């Protein structure tokens, strides 16, 4: 009987959702890990992968951090006596010192907090990776697109040279 490496299987499926547009829209300078305050039906939906982080952002209000716009679709088998709001604002679990530091950066230096990914920590805890960044201008986005296309073209040429040699 062959044993499978259980650690690699857990790490491979640890990422629940990823915000792919965040790195295109924002220049990320720092990353922070935060916990989420969730309801039971939300955890079940997250286990099934029904999460969307694309139009999501984080704001700080009265010394607490909240994630707004994260869509968690309820399952069809969700309880009927609980009202399931798919776009409910979720509280982020951060230390007071972290919140104060982030609030200062947002207010004084014009930074934005964007959820980058959602993943499982130690199998049972849902964590969110938050990026601290500034929005890119249109010309910055065009430069990034040109660089990405050049890398693809360069790899294509290198591959063609290796096959021909």
UniProtKB/Swiss-Prot annotation:
Pfam families, alphabetized: SmpB (PF01668)
Domain of life from the UniProt record: Bacteria
Swiss-Prot/TrEMBL keywords: Cytoplasm, RNA-binding
GO BP, sorted A to Z: trans-translation
Transmembrane segments: none
Gene Ontology annotations for the cellular component aspect, listed alphabetically: cytosol
One term of GO molecular function: RNA binding
Gene3D superfamilies named among the record's database cross-references: 2.40.280.10
HAMAP family linked to this entry: SmpB
Name listed for the protein in its UniProt record: SsrA-binding protein
Task of the protein: Required for rescue of stalled ribosomes mediated by trans-translation. Binds to transfer-messenger RNA (tmRNA), required for stable association of tmRNA with ribosomes. tmRNA and SmpB together mimic tRNA shape, replacing the anticodon stem-loop with SmpB. tmRNA is encoded by the ssrA gene; the 2 termini fold to resemble tRNA(Ala) and it encodes a 'tag peptide', a short internal open reading frame. During trans-translation Ala-aminoacylated tmRNA acts like a tRNA, entering the A-site of stalled ribosomes, displacing the stalled mRNA.
SUPFAM superfamilies registered for this protein in UniProt: Small protein B (SmpB)
Residue ranges the record marks as coiled coil: none
Gene: smpB
Main localization of the protein described in the UniProt heading: cytoplasm
Similarity section: Belongs to the SmpB family.
Subcellular location: Cytoplasm
Disulphide-bridged cysteine pairs: none
